[in-house]
């Protein structure tokens, strides 16, 4: 990958996990 793309993917993944966590709590 592209380094920037991989970092963006990690950021989006963390954001999705955070949203799911907040939705449950």
UniProtKB/Swiss-Prot annotation:
Entry GO MF terms: ATP binding; glutamine synthetase activity
Keyword Oxidoreductase listed: no
Assigned keywords, A-Z: ATP-binding, Chloroplast, Ligase, Nitrogen fixation, Nucleotide-binding, Plastid
Location in the cell: Plastid, Chloroplast
EC number: 6.3.1.2
Swiss-Prot/TrEMBL catalytic activity: L-glutamate + NH4(+) + ATP = L-glutamine + ADP + phosphate + H(+)
GO annotation, cellular component aspect: chloroplast
Keyword Nucleus applies: no
Function: Plays a key role in the nitrogen metabolism of microorganisms, animals and plants.
Subunit structure: Homohexamer.
Family note: Belongs to the glutamine synthetase family.
Protein name from the UniProt record: Glutamine synthetase 2 isozyme
């Amino acid at each position: 990958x592209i380094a920037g793309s991989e970092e963006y993917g990690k950021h989006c993944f963390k954001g999705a996990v955070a949203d799911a966590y907040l939705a449950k709590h």
